[in-house]
């Protein structure tokens, strides 16, 4: 029987997923709140609906009798996806796991409990509270929204760098307000700034096995906001450094407890140690997961994520998942 996949969001970043699922013989229902979303035209069925509404999407999913749901390259409806998986008994992350994977404070707590390396992090109460906490730091800091994706609202605050003027209290408060306005739950984290190169780690979790596909070197602009400008695969860093990044990412994924999904981890290296910035339980954006990873590794990450979602077991799926275990997995962590 033909599998039925619900794709939450149908923008330009979701088009490769919609097209790939159709190539795999899956019936695709694409949902987006924008009737002009470019991906809707490629689906077998297009639904214009508020994809952030759990009740609306639960109703649509039941009517469509879906076998799986995927929310690629975006986080706005992760809670919805988790709720659908729970209510309909589907493969993938739960609602609780979705919340943990989209709330940076809860994520940091999970990392700490799971011994996954990450920076010192404080959930602040106000700009004044954040400033007082910052005054106790012996390093520079980062202000970031507790709930948001990408680099929106993130800013470096300077305290100890001799090459720059320290951030004034007035400027600190302005940056805090920007982070607060960008946070979907109106809370802001103050974190230790990790000085060093930035990376992402592309992962597929399949039946409890955490499979690392590759490590991506990232190029960003300078402080204070760190917008991504480019990506390189495979990593140009040493094998030892790459293994440290992989190990940190695997520990982080296991700390979050997610299963049968793609993961996009972000990390930095400082003084030879890997630090996790965050992990998204989804395909990464900027065409890293949907295009670049396939080109550099030969592994179709989109197909693998879809297979994990709908649990499609056929010759194509087995071949793709077989590639994942070809020396890319890091067991025992």
Describe these PLM feature segments:
Residues 178-187, 192-235, 243-264, 268-276, ...:
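Phosphate-binding core of ATP-grasp and ATP-grasp-like enzymes
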Residues 119-121, 140-178, 187-188, 195-202, ...:
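Glycine-rich phosphate-binding loop of ATP-grasp-fold ATP-dependent ligases
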Residues 1-97, 102, 128, 306:
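ATP-binding N-terminal substructure of ATP-dependent carboxylate-amine bond-forming enzymes
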């Amino acid at each position: 029987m033909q599998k039925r996949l619900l794709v939450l969001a149908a923008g330009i970043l979701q088009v490769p997923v919609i097209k790939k699922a159709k190539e795999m013989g899956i019936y695709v229902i694409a949902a987006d709140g924008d009737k002009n979303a470019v991906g809707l035209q490629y689906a077998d069925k297009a639904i214009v609906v508020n994809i952030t509404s759990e009740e609306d999407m639960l109703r649509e999913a039941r009517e469509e009798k879906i076998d799986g749901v995927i929310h690629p390259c975006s986080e706005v409806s992760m809670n919805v996806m988790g709720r659908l998986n729970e209510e309909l008994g589907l493969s993938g992350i739960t609602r609780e796991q979705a919340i943990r994977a989209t709330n940076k404070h809860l994520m940091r707590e999970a990392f700490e409990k799971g011994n996954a390396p990450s920076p010192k992090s404080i959930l602040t109460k106000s700009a004044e509270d954040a400033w007082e906490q910052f005054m106790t730091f012996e390093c520079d800091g980062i202000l970031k929204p507790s709930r948001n994706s990408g680099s929106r609202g993130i800013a470096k605050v300077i305290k100890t760098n001799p090459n720059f003027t320290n951030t004034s209290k007035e400027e600190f408060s302005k940056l805090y307000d920007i982070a607060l306005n960008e946070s979907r739950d109106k809370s802001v984290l103050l974190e230790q700034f990790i000085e060093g190169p930035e990376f992402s780690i592309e992962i597929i979790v399949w039946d409890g096995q955490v499979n690392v596909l590759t490590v991506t070197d990232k190029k960003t602009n300078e402080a204070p906001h760190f917008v991504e400008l480019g990506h390189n695969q495979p990593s140009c860093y040493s094998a030892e450094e790459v293994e440290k990044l992989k190990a940190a990412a695997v520990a982080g994924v296991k700390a979050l407890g997610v299963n049968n999904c793609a993961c996009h981890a972000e990390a930095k290296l400082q003084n030879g140690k890997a630090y996790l910035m965050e992990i998204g339980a989804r395909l990464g954006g900027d065409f890293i997961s949907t295009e670049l990873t396939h080109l550099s590794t030969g592994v179709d990450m989109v197909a693998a994520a879809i297979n994990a979602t709908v649990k499609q077991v056929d010759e194509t799926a087995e071949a793709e998942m077989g590639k994942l275990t070809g020396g890319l997995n890091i067991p025992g962590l």
